[in-house]
């Protein structure tokens, strides 16, 4: 996507968040896993002249593979070049997956190291940030885990933990993440 001259380039979530903050509006982030969902979301965004974050979850990766989903987003960008779009990996759990998505054209990845202890989460997140930033992508980290099931990730009540506010500044400074998902209930 980045090298194509016939479609608008993906934007990063950092660019979107800055404009939204300055403009006082929210940005929709939607998990996508097939052509019809991508079409419906981008057509609605075009009608409303709204930027959009298209996310690829673990379930979508199992169903369609992120490589196929990149091509669907490329098609949406050809159809609607006027819409700022970010392609975001949602809850990536390994460096290798994040690297594959960055290499495949994603403008943003989330590394969810919340299943690790704090120091391992910091190390993993920092490694992803270093790679992604070197390749023009941005990174969302995660601190804390909510109980429940999202896609195939089942977090028991015993393993759940809210984000410790005392760790936030240290985590952001040590990892250089661009955004942070927190668990507050």
Language-model-detected regions and their locations in the chain:
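Short catalytic-loop micro-motif centered on adjacent basic/acidic residues
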Residues: 27-31, 86-88, 110
């Amino acid at each position: 996507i980045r090298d194509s001259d016939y479609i608008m380039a993906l934007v990063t979530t950092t660019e979107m968040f800055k404009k939204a903050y300055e403009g006082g509006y929210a940005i929709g982030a939607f998990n996508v896993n097939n052509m019809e969902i991508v079409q419906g979301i981008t057509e609605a965004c075009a009608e409303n002249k709204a930027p959009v974050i298209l996310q690829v979850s673990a379930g979508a990766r199992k169903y369609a593979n992120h490589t196929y989903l990149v091509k669907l987003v490329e098609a949406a960008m050809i159809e609607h070049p006027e819409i700022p779009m970010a392609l975001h990996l949602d809850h990536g759990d390994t460096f290798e997956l994040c690297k594959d998505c960055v290499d495949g054209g994603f403008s943003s990845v989330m590394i969810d190291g919340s299943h690790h202890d704090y120091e391992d989460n910091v190390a993993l997140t920092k490694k992803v940030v270093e790679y992604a930033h070197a390749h023009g992508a941005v990174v969302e980290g995660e601190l804390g885990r909510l109980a429940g099931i999202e896609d195939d990730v089942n977090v028991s009540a015993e393993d759940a933990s809210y984000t410790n506010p005392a760790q936030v500044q240290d985590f952001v400074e040590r990892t250089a993440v661009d955004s942070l998902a927190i668990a507050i209930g």
